[in-house]
Amino acid sequence: MELLCPAGNLPALKAAIENGADAVYIGLKDDTNARHFAGLNFTEKKLQEAVSFVHQHRRKLHIAINTFAHPDGYARWQRAVDMAAQLGADALILADLAMLEYAAERYPHIERHVSVQASATNEEAINFYHRHFDVARVVLPRVLSIHQVKQLARVTPVPLEVFAFGSLCIMSEGRCYLSSYLTGESPNTIGACSPARFVRWQQTPQGLESRLNEVLIDRYQDGENAGYPTLCKGRYLVDGERYHALEEPTSLNTLELLPELMAANIASVKIEGRQRSPAYVSQVAKVWRQAIDRCKADPQNFVPQSAWMETLGSMSEGTQTTLGAYHRKWQ
């Protein structure tokens, strides 16, 4: 089982490798990836350094080019694939069908991974990508139960990657319109949900308010942990009551499911957080490296250590964690 860690910059990439990541995933410094935030991601020069460092340590580098090409910008997405391939990427994480075809025809020797943004949630969808683009892996969305994940692993020949820890998206990724509705800009094309330029914080007599494109998302009292204003994690008035109507600010943590994921032959567990600090990457990678090694050695008796859970809890949104859809009954 591969431990795949995020990096939004070179220090985070080095922290991931030095703390046990088998592979690191990154994005380029433009809107071809779904974490397009100011100050984040890699220029061509930094990408060269990243490839060199990762390969010196005999690890792998995956590059996310997982937004959807604009009608007048297809050549930019092609150039992103070209640069990633020519500089030595081990895998390309793609969602756009045209980009999958381009990469398969131009660079058949480089692994193609179907991004979570493609939202492949069933056997036929996965096999479609395998049949047409010979993909080496599919990243499953965070809306599937553990039973559904196991079932897919049994029936498809394509290795599967699952999100194991980090920010929790409760929507069918690549198909959510909340951010687009409020800001007029789609995460599928500009590369960011709740883009930072639409975010505003304001201290008021009622508390600290977070707004997205001037729409109130949440209000925090003194001592409350303030989360980034994503619409699905806001507090709203519903039938006269104010609460988290869709999802509370919380992070996914599947550490206790590790034996089941290993038994299902899941190829890779993915840590979310390219927008997070090197310190976050370092601590989370270290915990997951220890846990994977312990589980491999004795899966029958594996129990997450309390110290691991405390560390992950302290790194989590709202300092709380959940199994998310893996154990939700509504499925």
Curated annotation (Swiss-Prot):
Outcome following mutation: C232A: Decreases iron-sulfur binding
Binding site for [4Fe-4S] cluster: C169, C176, C193, C232
Protein biosynthesis as UniProt keyword: no
Biochemical pathway: Cofactor biosynthesis; ubiquinone biosynthesis
Keywords: 4Fe-4S, Iron, Iron-sulfur, Metal-binding, Ubiquinone biosynthesis
Pfam families: Peptidase_U32
Single GO molecular function: metal ion binding
Keyword 4Fe-4S among UniProt keywords: yes
Function, in words: Required for O(2)-independent ubiquinone (coenzyme Q) biosynthesis. Together with UbiV, is essential for the C6-hydroxylation reaction in the oxygen-independent ubiquinone biosynthesis pathway.
Subunit structure: Forms a heterodimer with UbiV.
PANTHER family: PEPTIDASE U32 FAMILY (PTHR30217), UBIQUINONE BIOSYNTHESIS PROTEIN UBIU (PTHR30217:SF3)
Family assignment from sequence similarity: Belongs to the peptidase U32 family. UbiU subfamily.
Protein name: Ubiquinone biosynthesis protein UbiU
Gene: ubiU
